Amino acid sequence: DLYKIAEICRDKGVKSYLTVNTVIYDEDMTLMRSVIDAAQKAQISAIIASDVAAMTYANEIGVEVHLSTQLNISNAEALRFIALAMWSYWQRAEYGSGTYNPRDHRQGHICGPKGHPVRIEMFAHGALCMAVSGKCYLSLHEHNTSANRGACAQICRRGYTVKDSGLELDIENQYIMSPKDLKTIHFINKMMDAGVRVFKIEGRARGPEYVYTVCRCYKEAIEAYCNGTYDEESIGRWDEQLATVFNRGFWDGYYLGQRLGEWTHRYGSGRTRQKTYVGKGIKYFSRLGVAEFEIESGELHIGDEIVITGPTTGVIIQKVEEIRYELQTVEKATKGQRISIPVKEKVRPSDKLYRFDKREE
């Protein structure tokens, strides 16, 4: 899939990144190099790495490296050290050893391999690790699957009973190790003013409507700040939209000086709506702007909000304005029927059709 994904990204003018940020042991070196070689061949924009071995090899073969939060850099001097090391590796690969003098660095700047100031990337939205992306061993201890090797079993997301010396403690919330999700859209202006140039969104294992909604909201927020239209009304609208997709509740993280974390009060998502599978795409009539679907589960009504997803189609979100069954306009469609509805974009065979429903607490 790597080559196909990279090709799609290039065709759409989107950068692609590959995470190679697990703990790497000696026996992993061959695999690590083959993965980075594949990233280079596929023309992936950059890898995200935390192990020095991965960063060194990527620099040697000319693959751009972004430092992962797993590297646990917490001060400017640590960042300067990594930046100088990567510059040295790059210079050695380009011009041979002994050509770089650290004193040539401009004072006050932390520069990357090609001499440009290092860009600061920060997470802006999404799930948070209770270990702050550190070396967590809960999953390894309980299930022998290492969170540091890409196999976290999400042990921290469960509810727990707290005991001390045999006494059970009365606590307000049983999810004592499951943080709420990060949300910064209401102070994205402060992050931009601070010099952040790349915003990262945690979206692993999330549905396409999550990626679509969250990326769109933050893109609108950044553009609004740049053109002077960033205001409370817009923030309220984005907040409502972000609440409709997967979340465990939201908080500001530690960005604004908060010293204690905020923990979720539920297992799973707190989104305000959920998607229900309805059917699959059959055909699209481009001249009419109409798509044919086969209803495979439940019902579809006029006025329902739907999402259509597919590997090529991406995400289409809209309301059902009309339903036609056997050339007749109907109020609803039921399982087994082949129906047509107006759709603003092309739908492809086997695209999945979902209905958005208000989530029951």
From Swiss-Prot:
Membrane among keywords: no
E.C. numbers: 3.4.-.-
Pfam families reported in the protein's UniProt record: Peptidase_U32 (PF01136)
Keywords assigned: Hydrolase, Protease, Virulence
GO molecular function per UniProt: peptidase activity
GO process annotations (BP): biosynthetic process; proteolysis
Cofactor(s) required for function per UniProt: a metal cation
Keyword DNA repair annotated: no
Regulation: Activity somewhat enhanced by calcium ions, inhibited by zinc and Fe(3+) ions and by p-chloromercuribenzoic acid and EDTA. Activity is enhanced by salivary peptide cystatin and reduced by salivary peptide histatin.
Annotated family: Belongs to the peptidase U32 family.
Record text on subunit structure and interactions: Homodimer.
Function: Has collagenase activity. Active on soluble collagen, reconstituted type I collagen, heat denatured type I collagen and azocoll, but not gelatin or the synthetic bacterial collagenase substrate PZ-PLGPA. May play a role in virulence.
Name under which the protein is recorded: Collagenase
Organism listed in the record: Porphyromonas gingivalis
